[in-house]
């Protein structure tokens, strides 16, 4: 199992030999510094603790600074544990952990939309737009919680109402790695990844085994990338 923390740069396109445009998301991966190693004997599970995104010392409190000094590392903004990853303290995990043609899972928070109404949040229909409608056009309407009978005099949990929309942790699975630019710390992934530009993305090697890329043009693109990288070596 391979894992990395990265930053979403944005989206672009890569072109196959036949001119087909393939949408790709660009992820910048600053080297993930290993801060600590958890073992099954001492901690009950195997994992490594990494730090990501270098910050100034004044941005952190003293307990966190002591943790970084113990690991002989620069202060980092984000600390994350990766289960079942083998590495030593002080090592750096880079984009070279992944290679073109590999499948990965991307986990990130979706774009936040703040407090929104039920039409945008739950795709409700609008009310009549005629002048005689009288009723506000974007109201929720009745939620059928009146008196008597089977109608409870309360609002059940989960009722679709206005509220906070977006900023939810979402995992997109089995995304194809199109290219890895180790000298620029960039990785190109086929398709879209949740979140706005500048958001933190967790990349993990996909658990799905035996998946075959069905698009022959993308297969040829990856084959050409592999042959060119071997020639450069």
UniProtKB/Swiss-Prot annotation:
A single GO cellular-component term on record: cytosolic large ribosomal subunit
The record's keywords, sorted A to Z, are: Ribonucleoprotein, Ribosomal protein, RNA-binding, rRNA-binding
Do you know which PROSITE patterns this protein is assigned to?
A: RIBOSOMAL_L3
Q: Name one GO molecular function term.
A: structural constituent of ribosome
The record's listing under SUPFAM superfamilies reads: Translation proteins (SSF50447)
GO BP: any one term: translation
InterPro entries (alphabetical): Ribosomal_uL3, Ribosomal_uL3_bac/org-type, Ribosomal_uL3_CS, Transl_B-barrel_sf
Source domain of life is: Bacteria
Q: Which HAMAP family match?
A: Ribosomal_uL3_B
Q: Which family does it belong to?
A: Belongs to the universal ribosomal protein uL3 family.
**What is the protein's quaternary organization?**
Part of the 50S ribosomal subunit. Forms a cluster with proteins L14 and L19.
Tell me the protein's name.
Large ribosomal subunit protein uL3
Species name: Ureaplasma urealyticum serovar 10 (strain ATCC 33699 / Western)
